[in-house]
Curated annotation (Swiss-Prot):
Cell wall formation. Belongs to the MurCDEF family. InterPro entries: Mur-like_cat_sf (IPR036565), Mur_ligase_C (IPR004101), Mur_ligase_C_dom_sf (IPR036615), Mur_ligase_cen (IPR013221), Mur_ligase_N (IPR000713), MurCDEF_pg_biosynth (IPR050061), UDP-N-AcMur_Ala_ligase_MurC (IPR005758). PANTHER family: UDP-N-ACETYLMURAMATE--L-ALANINE LIGASE, UDP-N-ACETYLMURAMATE--L-ALANINE LIGASE-RELATED. GO terms for biological process: cell division; cell wall organization; peptidoglycan biosynthetic process; regulation of cell shape. This is UDP-N-acetylmuramate--L-alanine ligase. One of its GO terms (molecular function) is UDP-N-acetylmuramate-L-alanine ligase activity. The gene is murC. It is an enzyme of class 6 (ligase). It holds the Pfam family Mur_ligase_M. The lineage of its organism: Bacteria, Pseudomonadati, Pseudomonadota, Alphaproteobacteria, Rhodobacterales. It comes from Cereibacter sphaeroides (strain ATCC 17029 / ATH 2.4.9).
């Protein structure tokens, strides 16, 4: 048995179906670091799978029954459905089939754990908590939902007692995770295809918080009405609140922005009057990012970190991939790639962009899933108000069938009907390039938003602009 886990040390190859997924790859990487043999498949190779191969994993491009080889256990995510050839082969052989969250929970069993949940902000907050614990000398194990720039990966295996994980509420699996400290950033109606109703999602978050042990801690953002209501329902667990509001235990005050950097103080109201961390800075704009940082500060203080350590760690924060990531600057125009695909996220990112530049903000969005656009259509029509120009690409279907009234052109029409002065459709990367050449001027910012292929467009855009300009 491995000292860091209860998994048998002699366990044969662990096969991941969909190993290139951001949630699966982090678990695979930590297992390899612990000495286990890992293999897996995905539809195509990627930077993630290339990294895993460089660490010793065996990768199969495409999914077929023969890929299992001598696998002793098969790990699947909620995206893997009945009929997948590798899943069917595993069941035919009688192999254990383990959900991603179940394997993650196994890795967490021998440690104290910090689990970060919320409809938005999980990945950035997870990265911030990891950054602070690194600075505090805790040497945590980390499994995140995005690539942490300081690691060059979404995971690392540390030697310390603590483990920091992003807790995914999309399929309810976060309630399987044995959290010691549970963070809740916000709660919005999302992933209704799993939960069925907002009340069921609320219950899921309630269970997430109340599942912590009696000696644990819940860290909750009471700027969000749903989270404040959750706090009011929890009566038998210790809770520390954070936010901008005057009642928060860990509160941001004196916030200002300068050249895209947030400067603020943190009032530690739960520690008594006069306890303040002064002179905090965070090298990324956005009130939502400051809020995420407050959650990390609350955890760091709970674990005994000093004010100077916290201040220095956040000032050097390197960020996380696809969370307001600058991918280039051409002719004075800054190009940003961001994962935001929910109206709340889009509005927050565009507000951050407005705080970061003196010029105009040009938003380019690829809606993710017809079902999301359909269920939140009015919110999508009003979340782009901070953008001077909005361009909407074709919906990234993610396997869904089109829904009447929930397409690209419908959203453009909806934006115009709701009063946006400059909304238009784009068809392809060439259209995006033409748009930027036509609209962008020095000092402007182009923000590409979405969870699909829009990231590739954003990353290609600087070279396209420079190549055509040469």
């Amino acid at each position: 048995m491995n000292a860091a886990t209860k998994l048998p040390g002699e366990l044969g190859p662990i096969h991941f179906v969909g190993i290139g997924g951001i949630g699966m790859s982090g678990i695979a990487e930590v297992l390899m670091t612990l000495g286990y043999r890992v293999q897996g498949s995905d539809a195509k190779a990627s930077k993630i799978t290339e990294r895993l191969v460089s660490l010793g994993a065996t990768f199969f491009e495409g999914q077929r029954a023969g890929n299992l080889g001598e696998a002793a256990v098969v790990v699947i995510s909620s995206a893997i459905k009945k009929g997948n050839p590798e899943l069917e082969e595993a069941r035919l052989r009688g192999l254990p089939v383990v959900r991603r969250a179940e394997m993650l929970a196994e890795l967490m069993r021998m440690r104290s754990n910090i689990a970060i949940a919320g409809t938005h902000g999980k990945t950035t907050t997870t990265t911030m908590v990891a950054t602070l614990l690194d600075k505090g000398g805790f040497d945590p194990t980390v499994i995140n939902g995005g690539v942490i720039h300081a690691y060059g990966s979404n995971a690392r295996a540390g030697a310390g007692e603590w483990m920091v994980v992003e807790a995914d509420e999309s399929d309810g699996s976060f309630n399987r995770l044995p959290a010691t400290i549970a963070i809740v950033t916000n709660i919005d109606p999302e992933h209704m295809e799993h939960w069925g109703s907002f009340d069921a999602l609320r219950k899921g978050f309630y269970d997430f918080v109340t599942n912590i042990p009696f000696y644990g801690l819940a860290v909750c953002c009471t700027d969000h009405a749903e989270v404040q209501a959750l706090v009011g329902r929890v009566t038998d667990r210790r809770i520390v609140t954070f936010g901008f509001n005057a009642q928060a235990d860990v509160r941001a005050i004196n916030l200002r922005y300068e050249n895209g950097i947030a400067h603020f103080d943190v009032a530690l109201q739960s520690e008594g009057a006069g306890h303040v961390i002064e002179g905090m800075s965070l090298p990324m704009p956005g009130d939502h990012n400051v809020s995420n940082a407050l959650a990390a500060v609350a955890v760091a203080r709970h674990l005994g970190m000093k004010k100077d350590e916290i201040r220095e760690a956040l000032a050097a924060f390197g960020g996380v991939n696809r969370r307001f990531t600058k991918v280039g600057e051409v002719g004075g125009v800054t190009i940003i790639d961001d994962y935001g695909h929910h109206p709340v996220e889009i509005a927050a990112v565009l507000k951050a962009a407005r705080q970061a530049v003196k010029g105009r903000v040009i938003a380019v969005h690829q809606p993710h899933r017809y079902s999301r656009l359909h269920s939140l259509f009015d919110d999508f029509c009003t979340c782009f108000n901070e953008a001077d120009v909005v361009a909407i690409a074709e919906v990234y279907a993610a396997g869904e069938d089109p829904i009447p009234g929930a397409g690209r052109d419908d959203l453009v029409a909806g934006l115009i009907a709701h009063g946006h002065r400059h909304a238009r459709a784009i068809l392809c990367e060439d259209d995006l390039e033409r748009l930027v050449r036509e609209q962008a001027r020095p000092g402007d910012m182009v923000v590409c938003l979405g969870a699909g292929t829009i990231s590739a467009w954003a990353n290609n855009l600087p070279a396209r602009l420079m190549g055509k300009a040469a």
